């Protein structure tokens, strides 16, 4: 296999909340409208930003992370995208240099130039100092330039532009506008399907970008070929039911791809709307927002009975975060409303007003060693003894429990299944 060349940018910022998702989505929508094939990636383990970016580009969005995804798998994803795209966009995470690994680490590793998005709404000449710091903090960092966001007027944009050193390219400015805002929830953005006017917002952002910013394709980046890896069909003939609806939507596209590459047939179903399970051998219950759908979930008795029968028959279930909460005795929301859940795992969970856990996790299971992350606002009390506990690579004390009851495996951890394909197959193989 040989290297592939494709124009690429990594959209980063000095901090969260600067508008990375808006700018990345606007670039994706603008170039897609021009007939270009755009592939978008997201740094880190986030679920919600990729939903918006997939809508903007018309293509599935994958995560890139030097630890959770791994360097070799990240290389493969970028190389494959370069073979089918006219433009690759990567949205960073947090601030450009924040975290270990950071967005800057990814940019350096794969030679992708950084476009820094800076919220200029409350600054003038300091904009140039901030841009200079981002460019020069790591001299070896490939740096494309800066784009100002939430600019108050044409004159304000000119002041920001003129504050830049000559060595930093000005990509333009996006005006402050409610028409382009992407509402947020505690995990970041709301889910794409919850925004009835999302396409109008994306088009408005793309229009504004076309009028006030540089929109030519960036220079091509050479993406090295990955090491070829072959997967045995360990799940050949296995039918896996995957919950996917407004309550359970936190799915890594890479997880679905892996299960299919292992030979599984995926059948999607809705615990909110379906009265019965499809004919499946295994179940995958991902995370989401079950606390926002307590009544609908608790009132769907036929679905609850079907999942209980699946478990009683000794069939595999993998439940992550919100999927695990659905299997408890009960769940209480922030308004102190409690609902009966499925009762397959002893315990109660209660939603908290603040974040309860945020960390990368790696856990050793009998089936293998899986990586992933945890991010939740609930607290769980259960008498069940954990099968194992996760470890955080960044020295945080977070150590999420993994519970097992028969063939049911449940945890707050959102697993990145390609981190150990053999373990993924063993968890879901009948």
Swiss-Prot record:
Pfam families: CbiA (PF01656), GATase_3 (PF07685)
Sites annotated Increases nucleophilicity of active site Cys: 414
Any single GO BP term: cobalamin biosynthetic process
Keyword Nucleotide-binding part of the UniProt annotation: yes
Gene Ontology MF terms in the entry: ATP binding; cobyrinic acid a,c-diamide synthase activity; hydrogenobyrinic acid a,c-diamide synthase (glutamine-hydrolysing) activity
Keywords: ATP-binding, Cobalamin biosynthesis, Glutamine amidotransferase, Ligase, Magnesium, Nucleotide-binding
First-tier enzyme category under EC: ligase
CDD domains tied to this protein: CobB_N (cd05388), GATase1_CobB (cd03130)
Gene3D superfamilies per UniProt: 3.40.50.880, P-loop containing nucleotide triphosphate hydrolases
EC number: 6.3.5.9
Cofactor(s) listed in the protein's UniProt record: Mg(2+)
Active site, per annotation: 321
Signal peptide (from-to): none
Free-text function comment from the UniProt entry: Catalyzes the ATP-dependent amidation of the two carboxylate groups at positions a and c of hydrogenobyrinate, using either L-glutamine or ammonia as the nitrogen source.
Protein name: Hydrogenobyrinate a,c-diamide synthase
Species per Swiss-Prot/TrEMBL record: Stutzerimonas stutzeri (strain A1501) (Pseudomonas stutzeri)
Gene: cobB
